[in-house]
Swiss-Prot record:
Quaternary structure and interacting proteins, as annotated: Heterodimer of a small subunit (PriS) and a large subunit (PriL).
Cofactor(s), names only, from the UniProt record: Mg(2+); Mn(2+)
Name used for this protein in its record: DNA primase small subunit PriS
GO BP annotations, alphabetical order: DNA replication, synthesis of primer
EC number: 2.7.7.-
GO molecular function: DNA-directed RNA polymerase activity; metal ion binding
Underlying gene: priS
Reported function: Catalytic subunit of DNA primase, an RNA polymerase that catalyzes the synthesis of short RNA molecules used as primers for DNA polymerase during DNA replication. The small subunit contains the primase catalytic core and has DNA synthesis activity on its own. Binding to the large subunit stabilizes and modulates the activity, increasing the rate of DNA synthesis while decreasing the length of the DNA fragments, and conferring RNA synthesis capability. The DNA polymerase activity may enable DNA primase to also catalyze primer extension after primer synthesis. May also play a role in DNA repair.
Keyword rRNA-binding: no
Amino acid sequence: MTDNPADNKVFNEVSSLYKQYFDYAINVRKWLEIPDDLPHREIGYGMLKKVDNRNMSFNTNGEYLAWVLKESPFHLYKSLSYMEYPDVVGGAAKKGLIKREVAFDIDTHKTEKCTHDDSWICEECLGEARNQVLILIEDFLFPDFGLSEKDLKIVFTGNRGYHIYLKPEDTKKIGDTKLLEKIEKWEKNERRYFIEYILGKNLNLRNMGSRWKNILIREFKKNKISTKKFEKTSDWKTEIDTRKDNVRREIYETIGKVKSRLELDEKVMDDDIRLLRTIGSLHGYTGLMVKEITYSSLKSNQFDPLNHGVFSKFHKIMYNVNIKQEIDPLTLKGDTFDHKSTEIPASYLLFLFGHGIDFEILE
C-alpha cells in the first residue's frame, strides 16, 4: 500500500464497496439506523482509523443520509447521549447533556479453544460472545429488572461482540414515571453502580443479596460444593471461614470465575459522551454488518455472525488476489479462505483490508 491511500488500488476498491453497500442499505433496504432525535445526537466516523472525526451533527434525516452516501465511512457511530450542542468540541460539560441511552458492550477476546491470532475471529470466540450476552440477560436483566425480550435491543457489532440497549416498553414504570425515562436520566454514578453490581464489584460476602446468592449457589452445586448453609444465611464470609483450606480455596476460585464471566466494556456505561456503532453500518475491521437481532434468534443459536453478518451481495463479487503474508483461515458463509486463496469474494477482501493484511488485487 502506498503512503497516499487515494493512490492505492485496494483502498479505492474498498471505498467503492462501502459506497455500494450504503447505497443499498439506505435506498433499497432502509437498513441504516437514523438515531432518534437526530439534531441532538453526535455523529462520528472513521476511515483508516477507528475514529477520524466526531463532534458532528445533522439537522435533518435527509442531510444525514446524504452525507453517509457521499462519504461512505468504514466506521460510523452515534452518541448514546442526547445533547444541546452535539457538535461543540470540549467534552460533556460544553455539549450540554440532556439524557443518555443505557447500553452494554460485550467485547470478547480469543478463547482457549481459538487457534488463531489475537485479532482474528472464529466460531469459538463468537460463540463465547453469544454466551456472555445470554448470561447478562438471563442472570440479571430479566430476573433483577423485570425486563423481557421486548425491552431489549440486541445488536451484533460486526466483530467479536454485541451491544445490548435497555429500551423498556411504556408499560414499565416506577411509580408514575416510565422506566425508560428514569434510566435515561441516570447520572454517571448511577450507571457505574449498575454495571459494578452486574460485575460483582459490589459483592459483600458478609451481606449477600439474593441474586448473586442464587447465581453462586448454582455454580457451587456444579462444583459439588455443599450449599445448604449458604442457602440459609447472608453472612457467607463467616461460613466460608469454617471450611477446610482446600474447600475455602475452591469457593473463592469459583466466586472469582463467576465474577469474571462477562467481558463488559465499562467505559461504554461510564462515559457521558460515548459513541457506539450505528446499526446497519459495516464494521471497518471486518466488513461484517452491524446488525440488530432478536433474543430468541440468539438463544436458539439461529443467528450465525459468520453467515448472517455477511452482506450477501459481497459474497458474490469475486477478485483475483495475491495474499503476501501467512494468515489464519476464516470461514464466511461456509467458505474457508486463507493466505493460499487466490480467488476471494468482496466479503473476505474487506476483512483482509480491515486487518491490515498485505495483499494485492490482480487484473
